[in-house]
Amino acid sequence: MGCFSSKHRNTESDIINGSVQSSIPTNQPENHVSRDVLKPQKPPSPQIPTTTQSNHHHQQESKPVNQQIEKKHVLTQPLKPIVFRETETILGKPFEEIRKLYTLGKELGRGQFGITYTCKENSTGNTYACKSILKRKLTRKQDIDDVKREIQIMQYLSGQENIVEIKGAYEDRQSIHLVMELCGGSELFDRIIAQGHYSEKAAAGVIRSVLNVVQICHFMGVIHRDLKPENFLLASTDENAMLKATDFGLSVFIEEGKVYRDIVGSAYYVAPEVLRRSYGKEIDIWSAGIILYILLCGVPPFWSETEKGIFNEIIKGEIDFDSQPWPSISESAKDLVRKLLTKDPKQRISAAQALEHPWIRGGEAPDKPIDSAVLSRMKQFRAMNKLKKLALKVIAESLSEEEIKGLKTMFANMDTDKSGTITYEELKNGLAKLGSKLTEAEVKQLMEAADVDGNGTIDYIEFISATMHRYRFDRDEHVFKAFQYFDKDNSGFITMDELESAMKEYGMGDEASIKEVIAEVDTDNDGRINYEEFCAMMRSGITLPQQGKILPVQ
């Protein structure tokens, strides 16, 4: 059973009675799983070791590293296909010849839209994975939108330890290329099978990583929509390798008040409210609950020979805690499974609450603080000169709603009293929810850095300014608009007077600050800032966090 997706409106009875068109190839059984991890027969027999069985030896076919499981959309009416001219761009930036930047290596896997390879960066020798998507296969506007959104979300979530890092997105005349961190380890279930046995404590460690991904996504305003074991890879072959979420092809930004109706996901892991076509971020919690159930007993809780049968079982919602090995599983573990698989999404536990559950907290929680994406961005912002901060504020004011969906949700999550500003306490609590362990002094430093106008709070635009820069600097049009804002007379230069005028408008225009900016940015020492100097300033200090810790992969 691969991913399924539907863009037409069906009733719950349509889905249960089997009138929804299947996206599964006719040469495969309806409940085919993309991995042979789960092939339960009636009665289901565990295909992975459970917490009470220690010697299982399964011969598994080798799994391509970083293989993306491609989604397929199901439509009742055929749409007129899009035909691309070779001169047309999808990503909105100039074509780049990928082979000038990277040397492509062996094929790792292939999906509906393209092929994933290993690749080596020519300038550094670092090794990555390259997912090449053929543009001629993107025959519908929805396909194009999905690819663009996947790139945007991966860039937005960049910097999280449990999420695969994207290096860059490139486009040539034939393909779009996503270059990302190469996970050299196996799939989650492959590691468990190879070990032969594991404990509840080990299962708690795994689900902690999964829930951490969910919590970060939700706090940052993203719904994953396709959580399953196949979409988690180990960063390396090391015993204590980090688990990484790899596929965001079905992910969307959370829109306040929106009810989602698309049927997406993978059959075993799909929440009942998805089948009812009315859902929100809680579907990710359900999927995490299914993963935990499988970790503890070896089979999914809702099983059938067919996809229609699986959906029937999900709607019924009867969970077996009586069969082996459940009598020997702790009550605390079963309690967490029940809370994650609560049928009513409004009553379902959140990721943050699940991470506080005694069964998870009772385990060996990692001592190492997580340097979250938000925190790393704010640290970079703190180190910037005043002109750069001001330029980012100008850019933030010009961004569209589409471009800042996730950040808007994150601001709302931090602004707990809904005042429209973030106080010191709200910033401290918000960063703590993202896993950061900062001292009072460090939080105060970040607060002072983000509070551009110095009024003691961070307003919406200041927050966007301090957090959006990490993944927006390849957008030349934003940088050019910011330059034009300062260059009032359109001379092609920012003069001392123009700089003073703009900085005073934002309460930053003391003489020392202006001289400091000119001295730092004006590299040709002519007393003014040209566009090239401005661009160099905007792009300085932008690095790919975490990359050096795991690359190159040998």
Swiss-Prot record:
The protein's name in its UniProt record: Calcium-dependent protein kinase 15
Binding site for Ca(2+) 4: D522, D524, D526, R528, E533
N-myristoyl glycine lipid modification positions: G2
Domains (record comment): There are 3 contiguous domains conserved in the CDPK subfamily: a kinase domain, an autoinhibitory (junction) domain and a calmodulin-like domain. The autoinhibitory domain (365-395) inactivates kinase activity under calcium-free conditions.
Renumbered residue ranges of the record's region Disordered: 1-67
Chain's gene name: CPK15
Residues the entry annotates as binding Ca(2+) 3: D487, D489, S491, E498
Domain called EF-hand: residue spans: 402-437, 438-473, 474-509, 510-544
Family to which this protein belongs: Belongs to the protein kinase superfamily. Ser/Thr protein kinase family. CDPK subfamily.
